[in-house]
Amino acid sequence: MTVNPMAPRILIMAGGTGGHVFPALAVAKNLAEKGWQVRWLGTADRMEARLVPQHGFDIDFIDIQGVRGNGLLRTLAAPFKIMRSIMQAREVIAEFKPQVILGMGGFASGPGGVAGRLAGIPLVLHEQNAIPGMTNKLLARIATKVLCAFPNTFALAGQSVQVVGNPVREELALLGSMKQQGQHDALKVLVVGGSLGAKVLNEVMPNVVAQLSRSLSITVWHQVGKNNLASTKACYQQMGQAVNVNVAEFIDDMEAAYRWADVVVCRSGALTVSELAAVGLPSILVPYPHAVDDHQTVNAAILVDAGAGFLLPQAILTSDNLAEKLSLFANNPEVLVQMGKQAREVAVLDATNKVAEICAELARKS
């Protein structure tokens, strides 16, 4: 592909989890379609190393790892590793010469953001979670523009923070306007525990299905995560119920999964919460209890407080109380419809365009 040397250039920093990478990819595609040169900064051992090239973008790697809670020796070595990674990022920036840098979380964002500001390049930060990560908390003090998905995420004296929502794929935003909910022959339950799955959901759901199938018609599509396929299938088979269950290690086509589902049982990562709002689906949210600063519980509150989801903390999750919640949906299809509408009410559907335009505006001024 021929590269226009006069095209505006952006360096995007996002990695580690899908909650960082997929929103950043949405912005990258938006800008690329407008003729921008997009380059990525990440780490070689995290998911961005695989996903970003698959979507057609060049990626550079720096050597950086998380330092929070990693022991005394790694903590003592951290300053030296951070300085080295900042120098590596400066080399990438000097070679690519971006007009603007977008940080959306992950290990590479810290060194890349510092290197960019040292080079005098505008830095845009986007925080996907309701509670900011440590890297974004620090970078927010030097960023040119701070964006967040949810209100009251940052408290920065003398600096404006703009709430723009979380970028989601265009096809998901469109799906929400077309999706119809109501009475079906069977309640369609989508179970998603993230790319690695959720052990507790893998263990509880087969028992839930066994309970519900005695009196209700239910069908399940269950993403169990890497290396959990055989064990979870065995759990369902041990229940001895003739239930329609599709068990998958990973669901590549989430649009199809959301289109199929009536209700979602899931963790409450920022991207998941934003996608549920965009597609207008009710949910039963089981926050990951070991997330930094318990940010998944705060994320979940966005939907729960809007009447779009139920919160079931992992500490009290049982097959009985999960089955009770799903029975409510199965026996009251009007609840599905109403909660789906409430989810759609909190959706921010133009977040991708907003983030892209803010980056473009700063690039024009630089």
Swiss-Prot record:
Residues that, per the record, bind UDP-N-acetyl-alpha-D-glucosamine: T17, G18, G19, N129, R169, S195, I251, A270, L271, T272, V273, S274, E275, Q296
Membrane protein topology class: Peripheral membrane protein
Record pathway: Cell wall biogenesis; peptidoglycan biosynthesis
Record field: catalytic activity: di-trans,octa-cis-undecaprenyl diphospho-N-acetyl-alpha-D-muramoyl-L-alanyl-D-glutamyl-meso-2,6-diaminopimeloyl-D-alanyl-D-alanine + UDP-N-acetyl-alpha-D-glucosamine = di-trans,octa-cis-undecaprenyl diphospho-[N-acetyl-alpha-D-glucosaminyl-(1->4)]-N-acetyl-alpha-D-muramoyl-L-alanyl-D-glutamyl-meso-2,6-diaminopimeloyl-D-alanyl-D-alanine + UDP + H(+)
Coiled-coil stretches noted in the UniProt entry, renumbered to this chain: none
SUPFAM superfamilies xref list: UDP-Glycosyltransferase/glycogen phosphorylase (SSF53756)
Enzyme Commission number, as recorded: 2.4.1.227
Compartment(s): Cell inner membrane
Keywords for the protein's UniProt record, in alphabetical order: Cell cycle, Cell division, Cell inner membrane, Cell membrane, Cell shape, Cell wall biogenesis/degradation, Glycosyltransferase, Membrane, Peptidoglycan synthesis, Transferase
Cross-referenced Pfam families: Glyco_tran_28_C, Glyco_transf_28
Protein function: Cell wall formation. Catalyzes the transfer of a GlcNAc subunit on undecaprenyl-pyrophosphoryl-MurNAc-pentapeptide (lipid intermediate I) to form undecaprenyl-pyrophosphoryl-MurNAc-(pentapeptide)GlcNAc (lipid intermediate II).
Family in the record: Belongs to the glycosyltransferase 28 family. MurG subfamily.
Protein name: UDP-N-acetylglucosamine--N-acetylmuramyl-(pentapeptide) pyrophosphoryl-undecaprenol N-acetylglucosamine transferase
Organism for this UniProt entry: Shewanella denitrificans (strain OS217 / ATCC BAA-1090 / DSM 15013)
Gene that encodes the chain: murG
